[in-house]
Swiss-Prot record:
One of its GO terms (biological process) is killing of cells of another organism. Binds 1 Mg(2+) ion per subunit. It comes from Loxosceles intermedia (Brown spider). This is Dermonecrotic toxin LiSicTox-alphaIA1bi. Dermonecrotic toxins cleave the phosphodiester linkage between the phosphate and headgroup of certain phospholipids (sphingolipid and lysolipid substrates), forming an alcohol (often choline) and a cyclic phosphate. This toxin acts on sphingomyelin (SM). The level of enzymatic activity is high according to Tambourgi and colleagues or low according to Felicori and colleagues. It may also act on ceramide phosphoethanolamine (CPE), lysophosphatidylcholine (LPC) and lysophosphatidylethanolamine (LPE), but not on lysophosphatidylserine (LPS), and lysophosphatidylglycerol (LPG). Disulfide bonds join 78-84, 80-223. Its cofactor is Mg(2+). The lineage of its organism: Eukaryota, Metazoa, Ecdysozoa, Arthropoda, Chelicerata.
Length: 306
């Protein structure tokens, strides 16, 4: 009887290891996808969007006349079917976000691994961009990263709408270095969100001295249609030997058909008002073999190789 039990246990161990290896191989061959909850500007919306399936969120950041980040506010107009006026004081939002992304906190949401800050720098003069970056860094360091002491763990993307505001990136980096935490730049990525020519975007990054940690967005409000020609150009840059883009995301996607089109185009992220729609498509037979929802173990700055 004993040899039989040993044999059974041995076979079960082999099968379990094979199944685990198979799962790991399937995970490794599937593109990780960031489902980005759009316009998450109130603390209560963090749980709302994550519970619907988002593993990342996008938050608007408005600035005052002195280039201080002031509110998490979008304003009118915004996407069709959304409340455009929800907001928090920026630092209050950061504290709520820190709670949601700090392991051990009662508010912790393990699935929330990336935050895109949509920086509304259109209200600023070009010569204020560097200062805005410095002030943004100071706020994040204190209220999100808790001065480097067990702060929030999510990766951060600084999304800038104007190529002329590239000095914001340098100001942000310089301030973190000055405050003794240059290592936090490992958690920070970049995006220019103005739908500019891909070549012009590359020139802006050269001026900013940035290589790596680059997401490229493309999109338009859900109220209007938009083709995928620029997405295709961004994906081609990402996949080329000399491209500068690491990841591509498309916004704002609320329909299953558009989700399928975006996935077929090879995007890494989809920004949406309805994360459950994206999740449903990812679970379809045609897509679950090719894609999976990204986790914290997926580095958002590393280009996924097909």
């Amino acid at each position: 009887m004993l040899p039989y039990i040993v044999l059974v246990l041995g076979c079960w161990s082999v099968l379990s290891q094979a199944a685990q290896t198979d799962d790991e191989e399937r995970a490794g061959n599937r593109r990780p996808i960031w489902i980005m909850g759009h316009m998450v500007n109130a603390i209560g919306q963090i749980d709302e969007f994550v519970n619907l399936g988002a593993n990342s969120i996008e938050t608007d950041v408005s600035f005052d006349d002195n280039a201080n980040p002031e509110y998490t506010y979008h304003g009118i107009p915004c996407d069709c079917g959304r409340n455009c006026k929800k907001y928090e004081n920026f630092n209050d939002f950061l504290k709520g976000l820190r709670s949601a992304t700090t392991p051990g906190n009662s508010k912790y949401q393990e699935k929330l691994v990336l935050v895109v800050f949509d920086l509304k720098t259109g209200s600023l003069y070009d010569n204020q961009a560097n200062d805005a970056g410095k002030k943004l860094a100071k706020n994040l360091l204190q209220h999100y990263w808790n001065n480097g002491n067990n702060g929030g763990r999510a990766y951060i993307v600084l999304s800038i709408p104007d190529l002329n505001h590239y000095p914001l990136i340098k100001g942000f980096k310089d301030q973190l270095t000055k405050d003794g935490h240059p290592e936090l730049m490992e958690k920070v990525g970049h995006d220019f969100s103005g739908n500019d020519d891909i070549g012009d975007v590359g020139k802006a990054y050269k001026k900013a001295g940035i290589t790596g940690h680059i997401w490229q967005s493309d999109g338009i409000t859900n109220c209007l249609p938009r083709g995928l020609s620029r997405v295709n150009a961004a994906v081609a840059n990402r996949d080329s030997a000399n491209g500068f883009i690491n990841k591509v995301y498309y916004w704002t996607v609320d329909k299953r058909s558009t989700t399928r089109d975006a996935l077929d185009a090879g995007v890494d992220g989809i920004m949406t008002n309805y994360p459950d729609v994206i999740t449903d498509v990812l679970n379809e037979a045609a897509y679950k073999k090719k894609f999976r929802v990204a986790t914290y173990d997926d580095n958002p700055w590393v280009t996924f190789k097909k």
